Amino acid sequence: MTAIVDIIGREILDSRGNPTVEVDVVLEDGSVGRAAVPSGASTGAHEAVELRDGDKARYLGKGVLKAVEAVNGELFDALGGMDAEQQVQIDQTMIELDGTPNKGRLGANAILGVSLAVAKAAASSYDLPLYRYVGGTSARTLPVPMMNIINGGAHADNPIDFQEFMIMPVGAASFSEALRCGSEIFHTLKGELKKAGHNTNVGDEGGFAPNLPSADAALDFVMAAIGKAGYKAGEDVMIALDPASTEFFKNGKYVYEAEGRSLGPQEQAKYLADLVARYPIVSIEDGMAEDDIEGWKAITDLIGDKCQLVGDDLFVTNVTRLADGIKNGYANSILIKVNQIGTLTETLAAVEMAHKAGYTAVMSHRSGETEDSTIADLAVATNCGQIKTGSLARADRTAKYNQLLRIEQELGAQAHYAGKAALKAFR
């Protein structure tokens, strides 16, 4: 009944108008699973490879017909007839078929599309929501959203070096209340920016992209919006940052071009610690560059007991890299991006390893997204307690929030909002 009878890949567009891969998996009983693959702008050097065609005459070289061909050809040939319930075996078959350490031959975008579509087809066959199929009966925790309300760095055309300024409504009683809180702050911030003469255009992830001179200036606007919306910063709402420091780490220095200064690893750690002391910042992602292990150790020693230090480019959802961080004591959290590693099995393994080591895990989107809401289900399935999926604008972002609203309603009295417990180890 759950044997795979067809796998259909196609080229679609993501939220930036670039091609990406979408896959349908059809089972013997007629069940269909569909998954669309996201794409990042600030990508880690250690991520699995996203296969692009490189034909400049077509989509400026960004086409994904080679990946689609891999889906419809080699991957279907290898997986046709296999049981969709055998997720681990299916993912391992694709990894071995690719034969490279970074999925560079067939493409992580091809492999991931199939991996997720297989799980969704199997869930459909059992008439189960994806979060229940993957997570079992214990999957009932709704995550605290990290809502990206000011964009900078690679996600916006403005001078701010830090990539994301986010709010976390930890004090809400439910996910739906947290979403309302975030929406009210988002719209209040828009009014405050307009009043101050700033533009309110949005970046790739739906946050505002004003021309502000520094991180402090952005944080001051966020703090003002929280208060004016009727919430208490540090109690109802916490702040999270994603400097995406690899993007401005040059020749051993963190170069803040807008501010005209450069900081060494120890100075960068002290600068971030100072921000944590002055603002209710409870999470910093990629505060140090992906290969600046000295810097990661410095910041972990300095504020690791009071701030969530999330490794994104550092760990790239890879258990080998995460194991090194755990062993050597740097960072205390991992960002989970399904397309950084390329299969559902490896994604779940990274979350499990993090939790066993006492690290937190944050389920995450990419800046190039689609209307696919799989990560909302995975956040609940893994009970990770936190999700990062952009702002309160752009349908590619709100699709994930809306799916979480549906899940919360479906769970009813069983639903549990993670709230402050998601960050209990900090503050």
Curated annotation (Swiss-Prot):
Q: Which Pfam families match?
A: Enolase_C, Enolase_N
| Positions contributing to Mg(2+) binding | D242, E285, D312
Subcellular location(s) per record: Cytoplasm; Secreted; Cell surface
Write out the GO cellular component annotations: cell surface; extracellular region; phosphopyruvate hydratase complex
Q: What is its EC number?
A: 4.2.1.11
Alphabetically, the GO molecular function entries are: magnesium ion binding; phosphopyruvate hydratase activity
Where does the record place a coiled coil? Answer: none
The pathway it acts in is: Carbohydrate degradation; glycolysis; pyruvate from D-glyceraldehyde 3-phosphate: step 4/5
Provide the reaction this enzyme catalyses. (2R)-2-phosphoglycerate = phosphoenolpyruvate + H2O
Where does the chain bind (2R)-2-phosphoglycerate?
Q163, K337, R366, S367, K388
SMART domains under this entry? Enolase_C (SM01192), Enolase_N (SM01193)
Q: Which residues form the active site?
A: E205, K337
Q: What is its main location?
A: cytoplasm
- Write down how the cofactor binds this protein: Binds a second Mg(2+) ion via substrate during catalysis.
Cite the InterPro entries for this sequence. Answer: Enolase (IPR000941), Enolase-like_C_sf (IPR036849), Enolase-like_N (IPR029017), Enolase_C (IPR020810), Enolase_CS (IPR020809), Enolase_N (IPR020811)
- What's the cofactor? Mg(2+)
Q: Which UniProt keywords apply?
A: Cytoplasm, Glycolysis, Lyase, Magnesium, Metal-binding, Secreted
Please give the biological process terms from Gene Ontology that the record holds.
glycolytic process
Q: Which PANTHER family match?
A: ENOLASE
Q: Which HAMAP family match?
A: Enolase (MF_00318)
Q: Which family, according to the similarity comment?
A: Belongs to the enolase family.
Q: What function does the entry list?
A: Catalyzes the reversible conversion of 2-phosphoglycerate (2-PG) into phosphoenolpyruvate (PEP). It is essential for the degradation of carbohydrates via glycolysis.
The name on file for this protein is Enolase
Protein's organism: Rhodopseudomonas palustris (strain BisB5)
